[in-house]
Regions:
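Low-complexity, Gly/Ser/Thr/Pro-rich intrinsically disordered linker/tail segments
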Residues: 186-189
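Structural flexibility/helix-modulation signal
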Residues: 3-176, 180-181
Length: 189
């Protein structure tokens, strides 16, 4: 989860390309290969900045992970087991949505905290198992919901492939019409 949410957050919060536009051949001729590569990387890195589909997926994942789960009449969340994010102020850039386990010796941010997860596993393993099963199910359902078929996209796609296909067909048709008009004009003259 952490690797995925960190990557999504990084892509979503990417720096703006600002005034960077694709380079023309003339502009490329005046630049070194390194300069061209940096320029194009800046544009590519910002392609998914504030992308609505990516934002929706990110929000769905975060909601699934943070929603309380009721087991035997009691509500639990990840924080009940000492698993929580560091938040915007304490986390590294684009890692504010990643979860950390209190008492984890390998995590310098939370290693000094009490290990609530181990306590819960020792005292009531069935509750922890039930919670984790339900959490996994909730996350799966949230992602499945995002990948449902719609008038704009096919099932298991998170981008609007049907819409893109329709736009591609329309543009191809328009290009053919203009090519035909140009050909007719050339034949006329």
């Amino acid at each position: 989860y952490n690797n995925i949410i960190n990557e999504i957050t990084k892509l979503y919060n990417a720096d703006s390309a600002g005034s960077y536009e694709p380079l023309t051949d003339d502009e490329k001729d005046k630049m070194s290969d390194t300069e061209i590569e940096k320029w194009e990387t800046k544009i590519k890195d910002s392609l998914l900045r504030r992308d609505t589909s990516l934002g929706t997926i990110m929000n769905s994942m975060m909601t699934a992970m943070s929603s309380p789960i009721t087991i035997d009449g009691k509500d639990y969340s990840l924080s009940s087991f000492g698993i929580q994010t560091l938040g915007y102020l304490n986390a590294a850039k684009n890692e504010q949505n990643a979860y950390h386990i209190d008492g984890d010796e390998d995590d310098e941010n939370t290693s000094g905290n009490k290990d609530k997860l181990m306590d819960a596993i020792t005292k009531n393993p069935d509750t922890v198992i039930d919670f984790m099963k339900q959490l996994s199910t909730n996350l799966y359902k949230a992602m499945d919901q995002q990948m449902q078929s719609s008038s704009l996209r096919s099932r298991y796609k998170i981008y609007n492939d049907k819409e893109l296909d329709k736009e591609y067909s329309n543009l191809t048709k328009t290009i053919k019409q203009w090519e035909s008009k140009v050909s007719d004009k050339e034949d006329y003259y």
